[in-house]
Amino acid sequence: MGGYILKRLVSAIPVLLGITVIVFLIMAMIPGDPATAILGSYATPENVERLNRHLGLDEPLWRQYFIWLGNLMQGDFGRSFALNRPVLDEILDRFSATLILAGTAFVLCSLLGILAGVVSAARQYGLADKAITFVVILGISVPSFFLGMMMILLFAVQLRWFPVSGMYSIWGGGDLPDLIRHLTMPALALSVVATGVIARLSRGAMLEVLRQDFIRTARAKGVHERRVIWGHALRAAMVSIIPVLGIQAGFVLSGAVYIEMVFQWPGVGRMLVDGILKRDILLVQGGVVFVAACYVGFNIVVDVAQSLLDPRIRT
């Protein structure tokens, strides 16, 4: 097992290096001069030249990349131009909010998706299967940001059941019930598409397992159907379901970017959008690399969990 984990960690290195190259080149190709954006009304040619020299932006592009990469490997993400504070400090402050939102959405889509998939497979071609399939297709078809805006109009503006935006109330909020009220709509909007995908693939995995000989044997021995479904079939199907959960975790994490903008959630996604608008290069580059590293790390955990369920994967 230790060798397999080490192999997965080593394989993650070129992925992360590739991400640093891509995000660096994308930020370099964005129109506009960062120094001009930072200086604003003070952007005289002399000031722009002085700031570019101070930030190292007058160096060749390849040299800028290797300087940034070298600092990154030492844990130095640089300093935000717009916020005038270390990039890593800003990311860590924002990441807790993103983790709460994405983590809640991931738990919801995992539980609801697997439950819907199992019930749909157990009642194949029945009323429950058709109803779940209809709801799943509808959920997959609706963009999360559009669903979020519709939820705001209905549940926040019209019915006033939930707050419109933010993470806490500005008037004496900050407790757990207040957080739950603010979290409900964005977490649901973020989880809908992933729930549908997990449900569809869980249904397929369950149907494949239910056709296998050991399930027929269990039923022939008189094992209760509930135990056959939830005890034997689901356990065997989890080998195929777990990789799906890992992939959807990435989609949930990336989807948090626009959901945070719709609901004004103070997370990393909103920070990245603000950084792009302000041409805060180091903030955007550091944020993308940090989120990518979290996604890669989570997928390694998923692969290890899958290898525990199916040792053949390690070979």
Put a short name on every predicted segment:
Residues 19, 36-39, 63, 78-81, ...:
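Short, hydrophobic secondary-structure boundary micro-motifs
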